[in-house]
Amino acid sequence: MNKGIVDQLTRLSIRLEELDKLLSNEKITADLDNYRKLSRERSEIEPVTRFYHTYQQVEQDLATAMEMSVDPQFRDFAEAEIDADKQKLADIETEILKQLLPRDPNDERNIFLEIRAGTGGDESALFAGDLFRMYSRYAEREGWQVEIVSQNPSEVGGYKEIIARIIGHGAYSRLKFESGAHRVQRVPATETQGRVHTSTCTVAVLPEADEISGVTLNPADLRIDTFRASGAGGQHINKTDSAVRITHLPTGIVAECQEGRSQHKNKAQAMSVLISRILDKQVRAQQAEQAAARKSLVGSGERSERIRTYNFPQGRITDHRINLTLYKIEQIMDGELDELCSTLAAEHQAAQLAAMIER
């Protein structure tokens, strides 16, 4: 195992012993906030230290087996034990590295899902509607809740743009690799010659910012406009200026919400979207710097980056970042995204592991 990783594991083992002593101290247990903080730290490092202790025990077993192998009487038994112990060490090392990987602090958050029609005119808007249905069906399968924040329907169906909030444990961890350009190849219903048309939509997945996100907005930097909602909602919505648009003047970032009947609720939702977009911009700037040194296997997540092609005549979906092709387009468009999401997450983790080993 890499010496740097061994040193890190040794430090964690020492820290675990320190935490056990602290948590048994009455003065510590009397301070509930500090007790919770230390308990949380212990729960985070205990699994990897347990794996490390097992690794050390197997190392000792391997050393014993190698000593036994020089004795002709025990050679066959010892060699079998050596092979088994080496495999155990490799398996445990993989688990240790996974435990040491930096965790995305946003993984458990809700998300804002933004889908926008791109090139392809009406067909692009229709595909935006198909993508929204796909993600909505996936959310339904996961037991998540979907709330439409704003929508701009197309005259022919689908959406020029739709923004939704998806509420559910781990929503960001499952869908964060969906950001990018999605290309569709199919024969439009209006096509009389049977020609395949190509259209695109862009998808953005933003983790919802929480109240302690660290973003403080100066009211002087905000322009808040109210207007009459143009979407669904009935006569009441169209008679009142319930829709809200907030512009962050320093960055030019805009967020709006018009789905609720209450201007107050729409303003709160628009503010949440705005803060999430500002945070997303900051994170992307950091990721761009990191990507300059090492390009991630699953891509940068840039909105303009083509990540996936949906070819309906061939019944296939190809994710270009990991060269994965699945011939199950109907199931995927109906929200069966587990195989795609899991494979992307696994490839991302493999890239992280490779980078850790190289260091």
Swiss-Prot record:
The keyword Protein biosynthesis applies. It is found in: Cytoplasm. The modification N5-methylglutamine is found at Q235. SMART domains: PCRF. SUPFAM superfamilies: Release factor. Keywords: Cytoplasm, Methylation, Protein biosynthesis. It comes from the Bacteria. One of its GO terms (molecular function) is translation release factor activity, codon specific. Methylated by PrmC. Methylation increases the termination efficiency of RF1. Pfam families: PCRF, RF-1. GO terms for cellular component: cytoplasm. The keyword Protease does not apply. Belongs to the prokaryotic/mitochondrial release factor family. HAMAP family: Rel_fac_1 (MF_00093). PANTHER family: LD18447P. Peptide chain release factor 1 directs the termination of translation in response to the peptide chain termination codons UAG and UAA. This is Peptide chain release factor 1.
